Amino acid sequence: MRLFLLTIAALCWANAARAESERAGDFDYYVLSLSWSAAWCALEGDSRGDPQCDAGRGLTFVLHGLWPQFEDGWPSFCRTGERDPTRAETAAMADVMGGAGLAFYQWKKHGRCSGLSAPDYFRTAREAYRRVTLPKVFADVSRPLTLPASVIEDAFIEANPGLARDQITMTCEDGLIQEARICLTPELGFRRCGDDTIRDCRLKDAVLEPVR
């Protein structure tokens, strides 16, 4: 019994130490996460009946989030003295995130770790998204395409002068191209991704779902 209590105490101390170490504003770089909207719909959104997945939206890569990162690992759910965003502030992100529901969760998990206020975090995320040119070639995808994830990386690199291959990574899930993740300095310039972030899609080929 005593050993059990000591183990619980040690775990509590470790969690407290972790929370204390994840201070708001203490990070090395950002990951700008861009979701292929149709893939998110196929994996999650359709089952929810999310309006983001309605036909005719024409959404391609939408903003998933702007995530503070360490060179190894990442902070999350940090303590901050900043207030949470209002409903109006989260709703205002719908144009770049595909819908309003995601914005508040992104603030809670990642935004609080940025050291910024909620309005400034959303402004920074929006600016990061604005600075990246989305490859226009994918806007016309009208049927499922099977291709290597590296083809999409190549398109981003061609559309964004200065973006190098070690500054972008693709993810996939259930055989679908899921996200493009681009690594940025705190000033939103391109930079090399940490080793734990470079996790390219391991599939030889994956499916790019058609634009809805």
Predicted segment positions?
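Positively charged n-region of N-terminal signal peptides that target proteins for export
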Residues: 1-3
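Bacterial N-terminal signal peptides
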Residues: 5-12
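Domain-level detector of nuclease and nuclease-like folds
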Residues: 31, 45-212
